[in-house]
Design a protein with these regions (language model features):
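Histidine-rich, glycine-flanked metal-binding segment
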Residues: 5-49
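Metal-associated gating/positioning segment near the N- to mid-region
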Residues: 41-111, 128
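Hydrophobic faces of well-ordered beta-strands that scaffold small-molecule active sites
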Residues: 49-55, 85-87, 116-120, 144-146, ...
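Alpha-helix-loop-beta-strand connector modules within alpha/beta enzyme cores
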Residues: 98-115, 162-176
């Protein structure tokens, strides 16, 4: 690739880029090599491939399925310069982690056009789930997601505490979807009773201060567990 502006960890500079196979092997001005193909990228910016670490492909949720499967989603990713996606393997409540991971691998294998990996959601906490975790790490799964909302997924404060402690012991990292499920459910019931069912009612049942409460509660639970935690997809400054 000749004449582009290359973005690296050291900044942006005009340079040529030589790629062999899937690897960058040389970066500089006036590279001379017996390359098979030269592409003039003058006026273009060359980035390393981006990583989207939070996708939901072919996910059945709320009576529907997310818009993209692994084929269409990975093609769209590549068009935007994303060369790796990390999706969420989502076992159903009562399903083993291994079974859920197997189903997600079946969704992806032979259909995905970019590199991919998996996080694992945990929607139940019991001895069986805890006992499966070492095998998940052996399978390459070291990042997990927990929910503080949605009836089929939420963990209570006690289970959040135990899950965070166990994942820290194993060397994993955990992301948490923070909402106050109880109050939201109450507000939703009030809106339904009043017949206020338009899209405008949705944010009214999820005010910023409730997300902030859930974030604060999670941080205290993580403090008690002495565990690191990631808070996923914040929506407002108060929660931040």
């Amino acid at each position: 690739f000749k004449g582009g502006s290359v973005v690296s960890g050291k900044g942006v500079r005009r340079a040529d880029l030589l790629v062999e196979g899937e690897k960058v092997v040389s970066l500089g001005r006036g590279i001379k090599a017996e390359e098979d193909r030269t592409i003039d990228v003058s006026g273009c910016v060359l980035f390393p491939g981006f990583i989207d670490a939070h996708t939901h492909f072919d996910l059945e949720v709320a009576g529907t399925v997310t818009a993209d499967d692994f084929a269409s989603g990975s093609r769209a990713a590549l068009r935007g310069g994303t060369t790796t996606v990390i999706d969420f393997a989502c076992p159903n409540k009562g399903e083993s982690l291994a079974s859920g991971l197997g189903r997600w691998r079946e969704k992806a294998v032979g259909k995905t056009f970019c590199d991919y990996g998996f996080h694992m959601t945990i929607d139940d906490w019991n001895e069986g789930v805890r006992a499966e975790l070492p095998e998940m790490f052996a399978q390459g799964i070291s990042s997990f997601k927990l929910y503080m909302t949605y009836p089929a997924m939420l963990l209570g404060d006690r289970d959040l505490y135990w899950a965070l402690k166990e994942l820290k012991t194993l060397g994993g990292i955990c992301g948490v979807h923070c909402e106050n499920a109880g109050v939201i459910n109450g507000m939703v019931a009030e809106k339904k009773a009043a017949g206020e069912l338009s899209p405008a009612s949705h944010p009214q049942t999820r005010p910023p201060y409730l997300e902030a409460e859930a974030v604060g509660r999670l941080l205290r639970i993580a403090q008690a567990a002495q565990a690191p935690v990631i808070i996923v997809h914040l929506t407002n400054g108060e929660a931040l």
